Design a protein with these regions (language model features):
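Binuclear metal-dependent hydrolase catalytic cores
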Residues: 1-183, 260-294
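Cap/insert and terminal regions of metallo-dependent hydrolase folds
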Residues: 178-281
């Protein structure tokens, strides 16, 4: 499987000279399956550039899958600007979490009402299907994709995608169930040592994954003022991923206030923490344009 990051920012797009390296577009990742199928992970503002590239490279009609973790703005605002949706003959299957009083289709239609956007959902020329997903194991785009609830203020799913003996987890957005990760801080390191059952379940979901993409919007110092907003610290993410014996960890959903220099320091501190835990896990702050093979 191949991945390309088209948007790594959380909350709101933040273009400017201070975000040139890590990027200012909100959440969007392109996954290409071993069979050459395209799966779009979230449709934040990064989806616009991805859509333009898909059209430029298309030799025929575009058929793709869109997996939405949830429907907060930073994960769907690129949907109306995703140009392949406007092309007759293209086909898309769009999946997102059940649990709202509105269907996934109705939520996406809501942001495209004429109050907010000149083109309504029903005017899109591509063939589009919508499905509300529950927790569990699903067969999507020829792959086994598991979905699990994240700890976030709206209905949100994390995904584990399996192909060719490899697993990729995409986990955004998620807040720790307990600020203290370990039962005994003097003995960290294993899933069984994690204090809260919710955090243990979260770690189990990514156990043994070759590659995990996890939101890490805050530092531990910032978190107390952001409690219950539905986001993690890099320290929490490194600890649960190390306990789950993840091989490669990519931190994303960067806070809009974090410029390139700040995120380089986050990356340094996250790697240092992994080393302190005795984990060989590779830790990277994801940036726009980053391409990864899993």
């Amino acid at each position: 499987m191949r991945l390309r990051f088209w948007g790594t920012r959380g909350s709101i797009a933040t273009p400017g000279p201070g975000t040139n390296h890590f990027g200012g577009n909100t959440s969007c990742i392109e996954l290409t399956t071993p069979a050459g199928e395209c799966i779009v992970l979230d449709c934040g503002t990064g989806a616009r550039l991805l859509g333009n590239q898909l059209i430029a490279n298309a030799a025929s009609s575009i058929n793709a899958t869109i997996l939405l973790t949830h429907t907060h703005w930073d994960h769907i605002q690129g949907f109306p600007f995703f140009a392949p949706l406007f092309v007759p003959g293209n086909s898309f299957a769009v999946y997102g979490p059940e649990g709202s009083h509105l269907s996934l289709r109705d939520v996406l239609a809501g942001q495209m009402e004429h109050h907010y956007f000149p083109v309504e959902l029903d005017q899109l020329a591509a063939r589009i299907t919508y499905r509300d997903l529950s927790e569990g194991v699903h067969r999507i785009a020829g792959l086994q994709i598991s979905a699990q609830r994240m700890n976030h203020p709206s209905a949100t799913l994390g995904f584990r995608i399996q192909a060719g003996g490899e697993s990729i987890c995409y986990l955004s957005d998620h807040e720790p169930y307990c600020e203290e990760v370990w039962r005994d801080p003097a003995q960290p390191g294993h899933i069984d040592s994690i204090r809260d059952p919710g955090d243990r379940r979260h770690a189990e979901f990514m156990r043994g994954a070759g590659l995990v993409i996890h939101e890490a919007q805050y530092t531990p110092e910032e978190y107390p003022a952001k409690r219950n907003w539905g986001h993690s610290t890099y320290a929490y993410v490194v600890q649960v991923a190390a306990a789950a014996e993840v091989r490669r960890l990519f931190l994303t959903h960067h806070d809009p206030s974090h410029d390139d220099d700040f995120l380089r320091e986050v990356e340094r501190r996250a790697r240092e923490l992994a080393s302190q835990l005795g984990s060989p896990m590779e830790v990277v702050c994801a940036y726009e344009g980053l391409e990864v093979v899993a």
